[in-house]
């Protein structure tokens, strides 16, 4: 994003989120140094910074632009931010709409801003005659680490037994919201009204933990079924226990990842549970490399792409297996769709496009 802002001749200063008192004091002085805004991706991992954010905003008194690429609730948004000095974006459309319906969200609204790609890093290379991964590739972790949810899963009696029927519902139709499935189950189990249990912090924790586990099961099942002989899986070492020899180790984001994408028959995309409808980085980066993308369905596909002409999407593993066969049987058609997706990314979904959108909103303040 620094490079993207600089293409619009915006002077930028790249600094870390403050931790020491000296760093907090230095940041407070920025408003007097002529800076027009502060930009951050999420709000870091330090709860002390999030706790002090409102005070910082009131001291600096310049717009604070936040682009959430993770669930804003985990950062205490919108209560953690001063609405007078906050311009907040979110990569996920469903989360954006949900937060905006809350009373506090109306005071401090979110703006939907999808992820994008950097065409200076991800671009199509000459396709070799022999691909390194003719069976496709998946790049991603087995699960996003969350100690609170993992502890809830381990210590809640009967949790796995409760989740088995929910998994049976979810795995047959990935268009269904796992959050909705979990809330409906909990409402039926407790016999209480939905608004009542949604106000209960323990019920919210149970639903978050349920969605977390459903997401883990979804990713492991789909990856193990769809990436087979000739394929490769990159990510954390837990994959080695799940898929064995197909595990290729960890990979660095950037040039190394671009090379893997360009040497793969297709790129598999499966969202983490914190992304309800938000499209992942994989879709934009793999498309920028002009490689076929096989992804789970999201309504955002129909907003940001022409799904039938640019991507292949599925709602369950059986559909995904059939689409995979078609991708490999008809490479010319697959590559044609990938080229269309590449053109869409370059014309609408680069970080320069996102920087331009952010600057336009800032200008209107």
Where are these regions (language model features)?
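Catalytic binding pocket for nucleotide-activated donors in carbohydrate/polymer assembly enzymes
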Residues: 1-17, 81-82, 93, 98-100, ...
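Short beta-strand/turn micro-motifs composed of small residues
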Residues: 66-68, 90, 140, 235, ...
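Nucleotide-sugar donor-binding catalytic core of glycosyltransferases
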Residues: 1, 108-275, 298-301
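Extended catalytic core of nucleotide-activated donor transferases of GT-like folds
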Residues: 1-104, 118-124, 249, 254-255, ...
């Amino acid at each position: 994003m620094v490079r993207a802002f600089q293409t619009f001749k915006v002077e930028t200063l790249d600094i870390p989120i403050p931790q020491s008192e000296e760093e907090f004091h230095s940041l407070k002085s920025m408003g007097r140094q002529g800076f027009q805004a502060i930009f951050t991706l999420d709000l870091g991992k330090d709860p002390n910074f999030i706790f002090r954010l409102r005070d910082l905003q009131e001291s600096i008194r310049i717009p604070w632009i936040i682009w959430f690429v993770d669930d804003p609730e985990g950062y205490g948004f919108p209560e953690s931010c001063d609405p007078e000095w906050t311009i907040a974006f979110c990569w996920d459309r469903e989360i954006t709409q949900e937060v905006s319906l809350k009373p506090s969200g109306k005071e401090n609204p979110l703006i939907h801003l999808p992820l994008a790609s950097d065409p200076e890093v991800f671009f199509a290379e000459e396709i070799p005659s022999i691909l390194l991964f003719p069976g496709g590739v998946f790049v991603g972790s087995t699960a996003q680490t969350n100690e609170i949810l993992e502890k809830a899963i381990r210590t809640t009696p009967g949790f796995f037994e409760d989740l088995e029927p929910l998994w049976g519902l979810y795995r047959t139709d990935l268009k269904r919201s796992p959050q909705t499935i979990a809330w409906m189950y909990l409402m039926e189990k407790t016999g209480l009204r939905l608004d009542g249990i949604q106000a209960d912090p323990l019920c919210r924790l149970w639903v978050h933990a349920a969605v977390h586990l459903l997401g883990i099961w979804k990713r492991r099942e789909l990856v193990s079924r769809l990436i087979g002989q000739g394929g490769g899986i990159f990510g954390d070492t837990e994959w080695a226990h799940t898929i064995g020899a197909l595990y290729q180790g960890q990979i660095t984001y950037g040039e190394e990842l671009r090379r893997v994408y360009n040497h793969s028959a297709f790129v598999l995309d499966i969202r983490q549970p914190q992304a309800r409808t938000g499209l992942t980085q994989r879709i934009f980066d793999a498309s920028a490399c002009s490689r076929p993308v096989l992804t789970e369905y999201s309504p955002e596909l129909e907003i940001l792409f022409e799904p039938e002409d640019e991507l292949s999407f599925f709602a369950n593993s059986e559909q995904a297996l059939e689409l995979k066969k078609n991708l490999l049987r008809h490479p010319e058609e697959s590559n044609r769709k990938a080229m269309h997706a590449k053109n869409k990314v370059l014309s609408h979904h680069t970080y320069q496009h996102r920087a331009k959108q952010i600057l336009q909103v800032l200008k209107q303040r």
